[in-house]
Amino acid sequence: AAPSGKASESIKVDGKVGEASKTTFEKPLEIKTLERTVLFEGDGKPINGDSLVSYALRAFNAETGVELGTVGYGDGLLLPSQIKPESPLGQVLGCATVGSRLVATFPSNAEAPGEVYIMDVLDTVPTAAWGEKQSPVDGMPTVTLDDKGMPSVKMPGGDAPTSIEISVLKKGDGQKVEAGDTTLLQYYGADWATGESFDSSWSRGAPYSN
């Protein structure tokens, strides 16, 4: 995680975690490097390199104080993001706990001025299906899951189906997906003839959103 520093520690923030904050800071704010300060430490699950994190944020121009945007609160929920330690998001949220509020200061570059982010860690999301296991269907591929939920597939042999066939391996109890919804999903595609995977969100390192 990025270190705390003079710039991030100078930001004043009022409001509850999970609600858009009131933020004040000296303008223009001098930011020399990426910094983060934990304003409030939540008592939830800690974030690690495998976590899918639901979060909300407010962003400001560090030179003028103008608000750049507020997302993730109320109706403007963001899709969860996978935390990679080497990414800017990972450097800000890494090792934080659910329920925490952090402030991050980003230095300017050739394309943009410095920025100030107030970020709330709302929750972590499972990285694989967690629903109730269903009985296998005869004639369908056999799917085995490892301890992280990543599948391996054994084909049943014989000719491939001539039309789409679907069997449910785990049945969830969450909200029903409706037309127009945006979803976040893991997938694993395998060749019927060889059983070898030709594409997978696990091999890509992040879920697919659509």
Residue ranges of model-derived segments:
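Cross-family detector of peptidyl-prolyl cis-trans isomerase
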Residues: A1-N210
